[in-house]
Amino acid sequence: MDGAHSAGLQLQPLPPTSGATSTSLSSSEGSFSYKENLIGALLAIFGHLVVSIALNLQKYCHIRLAGSKDPRAYFKTKTWWLGLLLLLLGELGVFASYAFAPLSLIVPLSAVSVIASAIIGIIFIKEKWKPKDFVRRYVLSFVGCGLAIVGTYLLVTFAPNSHEKMTGENIARHLVSWPFLLYMLVAIVLFCLLLYFYKERNANSIVVILLLVALLGSMTVVTVKAVSGMLVLSIQGNLQLDYPIFYVMFVCMVATAIYQATFLSEASQIYDSSLIASVGYILSTTAAITAGAIFYLDFLGEEALHICMFALGCLIAFLGVFLITRNRKKAIPFEPYISMDAMPGMQDMHAKGTTVQPDLKASFSYGALESNDSISELYTPATLPVMQEEHSSRSTPGVPYRVLEHTKKE
């Protein structure tokens, strides 16, 4: 009986202990957070790649229409409009990436656009460098691309796994937290000091201007993540648009982005674009990561090794971007003056003693702001010896040409 009764007994599984439950929950949460990080990183990489392609398409269109008389001829080309659509698509991808991954991961991934621009500029735009500059330019550029890729890999691998729902309550709670209020106080004081020295003391250093951009940019990315996260939650069914904090963040996002673009435009009028790209990337990324770590607590609970490896990835990406941008060709400024000896046929005119006459009926007076419609002056010719150019061996020395001497009629 006992054997039959014992045979009929079935072992019941024991309920899981609290330790096992917490372990399984933490592993599932870790897997979910890693998937969200991967989705956000892929969206950001895709967005920056598409933005790079779009900007190079528009650059290619402007290069082809450089000699056009119509200053807005690019509006009539399909290439420029395709670039504009790709630009909007890329920016939308970058905007959506902030809703999935931490801010500290998305911001440094803008190095992808620098890598893509360097490669597309060589292949698509066909930027040509002299063979003697190959070692100085190509090798350093490829080394920079390699370092930027390694840095990007470290950023994605050791990125923080903080994933808090961007609800109106959470954002309002972070906005009035003491760490962020202290950061805002320091940022506002520093911004006012830099703005004073820039506007009143003419401190036009690139570090001063780009620090202004970086401080504004840190607030831009904080508000972008809030707006993007609240929009994604609203699309998923958890409506967040009825919170006033959404509109506060939206207004701050637009305002800081506009002023940031203004300072960048002023910097581009003084400094080379490659220098702005490298210094701006370093300063803006550092300020944005700092703001994200304080506002969204990105690194709260992270291991020290992960934080150090993430910082190492940032430093490697900084070095890669610097190497890529430091050897770009500087734009040659437009030179409105033409050497007379460089014009075809001018040497033959000098040899024959032909006078170079100005066009008196033209509406443009070279070197003066006078109208040539009514001419009542008397011109008497004078002669000067021709100066032989050092670079021209075909010019004939000693042959005079006449320069018109201007005297008023009495």
UniProtKB/Swiss-Prot annotation:
**Annotated GO MF terms:** magnesium ion transmembrane transporter activity
The segments labelled Disordered in the record are 1-24, 389-410
User: What domain of life is recorded for the organism?
Assistant: Eukaryota
Give the location in the cell: Membrane
An example GO CC term for this entry is: membrane
* Transmembrane regions listed in the UniProt entry: 37-57, 80-100, 105-125, 139-159, 175-195, 206-226, 244-264, 275-295, 304-324
Q: How is this protein positioned relative to the membrane?
A: Multi-pass membrane protein
The Phosphoserine modification is found at 376
Q: Name one Pfam family in it.
A: Mg_trans_NIPA
| Primary location recorded for the protein, binned into one broad class | membrane
Q: Which UniProt keywords apply?
A: Membrane, Phosphoprotein, Transmembrane, Transmembrane helix
Output the InterPro entries linked to this UniProt entry. Mg_trans_NIPA
Entry similarity comment: Belongs to the NIPA family.
Q: What is this protein called?
A: NIPA-like protein 3
- Organism from which the protein derives: Mus musculus
Gene name as annotated? Nipal3
